[in-house]
């Protein structure tokens, strides 16, 4: 998927997911 799509859906959630990694 396009990163922009994730940022549009929920940047906070994505950021947390990245930290989880």
UniProtKB/Swiss-Prot annotation:
Subunit-level organization: Heterotrimer composed of an alpha, a beta and a gamma chain.
InterPro entries recorded: FAD-bd_PCMH_sub1 (IPR016167)
Record-annotated membrane-spanning stretches: none
Enzyme Commission (EC) number: 1.2.99.-
Keywords, sorted A to Z: Oxidoreductase
Gene3D superfamilies per the UniProt record, alphabetical: Uridine Diphospho-n-acetylenolpyruvylglucosamine Reductase, domain 2
Superkingdom, taxonomy of origin: Bacteria
Molecular function terms from GO: oxidoreductase activity
This protein's name: Formate ester dehydrogenase beta chain
């Amino acid at each position: 998927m396009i990163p922009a799509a994730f940022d549009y859906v929920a940047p906070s959630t994505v950021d947390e997911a990245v930290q989880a990694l």
